Design a protein with these regions (language model features):
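Basic, flexible Lys/Arg- and Gly-enriched helix-loop patches that mediate nucleic-acid binding at interfaces
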Residues: 1-233
Length: 233
């Protein structure tokens, strides 16, 4: 059981102060009866809470998919650059959201933004080995030596990388699948072969892939089917 004002405020549309004002004005009902106190408790999964006659759709956690554009940092706040949270639709910003993982400021593609710490751990923890798929464009042609080296494990100054799959898709383009996430890892791996990464885009995480119709900068909720794909091992 939780306090009504906490339940409503947790959904991100109203602050607890605003919820108390709504209740005082008789605009909130619980199971069909007007509420008179914000301290009353209810089971958020079972109770029917309405605001101005409209049922509150309670969501314990929120899961958003963002097509990250260049220029945004993967953080909740930053003094120098805009953050990915600034791309979240206003109706979700009242929740304690954070990016599940990071992409460099000049990297684009799929990001998950959530308030579910358990899910974030499950898709980011090294022991989980969740594959992440990237599109890469280089300044020089992709070579067989790169492919073989990635599969064997590239040695960086912070250790040997786990085996990575490299699929050449064009003269200077490839898809890379990683199962770990080191700092600037793909850029450093190609740097070992004298190549510079000029474009980097994340296409997928686990079994979830970036939809072709989600434009850069767009952010929306995951569908139940997409969430299930993200959680599959």
């Amino acid at each position: 059981m939780e306090r009504i004002d906490k339940i409503i405020a947790s959904q991100g549309q109203y602050s607890r102060k605003e919820v108390k004002a709504l209740i005082a004005k008789g605009r909130v009902t619980l199971d069909g009866r007007p509420l008179t106190s914000s301290s009353e408790k209810a089971d958020p999964a079972a109770a029917q809470i309405c605001i101005d006659g409209k049922p509150l759709e309670f969501k314990r956690n929120l899961y958003l998919m963002l097509h990250k554009p260049k220029g945004y940092v993967s953080a909740t706040e930053d003094r120098e650059h805009p953050t990915v949270l600034e791309l979240v639709p206003p109706e979700f910003r009242g929740r304690e959201l954070f990016p599940a993982g990071r992409l460099d400021r000049d990297t684009t593609g799929l990001m998950i933004i959530t308030d579910d710490g358990v899910l974030a751990h499950n898709i980011l923890a090294p022991k989980k080995h969740i594959p992440k798929l990237y599109h890469v464009q280089l300044d020089i042609p992709v070579t067989d030596a790169m492919r073989a080296g990635f599969l064997e494990g590239v040695r960086l100054n912070d250790g040997v990388c786990k085996a990575a799959e490299l699929l050449r898709t064009g003269t200077c383009t490839a898809q890379v699948t990683l199962r770990e996430g080191r700092y600037h890892q793909i850029k450093r791996m190609f740097g070992c072969y004298g190549a510079e990464v000029v474009e980097l885009k994340r296409l997928g995480m686990g079994r979830l892939y970036l939809p072709e119709d989600l434009e850069e900068g767009a952010c929306r909720e995951l569908t139940p089917a997409e969430l299930a794909l993200l959680q599959k091992r």
